[in-house]
Amino acid sequence: MRYTHILIETRFDEPNSVVSHMTEDVTLAVGGIAPEFEAFLSDGSKFVLSEALSSGKGVILYFYPRDNTPGCTSQACDFRDNFGRISDGSWKVVGVSTDSAKSHQNFISKHELPFDLIVDEEAELHSLYGTWREKSMYGKTYMGTVRSTFAISSDGTLAWVGYKVKTKG
């Protein structure tokens, strides 16, 4: 199941109050406009896509299933190991998973990650970007994260889109 359009209403005076409305299927594509969003980082600060892009740098937004699992750790460490090359250019790296802020903080500390992680426990941002989809394992279906990466240019357009990306590990 893929989601095309999500309206997210969040009251910042009540951080856990989120209402989302999902409609038809769609997958984001290169050349399209990246969906605008506001979300909380693991340190409790707010990340606003348009504000991040206003710095003149693009944003590499990557979605991964779970902190401290082999594939996700490999992916995060690959971004870490290439961070100087990426961030010295024109990009800011931001990871997203449905893990808690505490889990993210431990993950960042344990692997010395030099970039921010967004807390998306209810998968609203995942749904907005089409990365929260029906999956199956051993004959059972469930909703989960499809490992995906989006390179968002400073003008807000999608310069690169990768669904079902593979990790080195």
Each language-model region and where it sits:
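Chalcogenol-based redox active-site neighborhoods
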Residues: Y3, F12, V18-G169
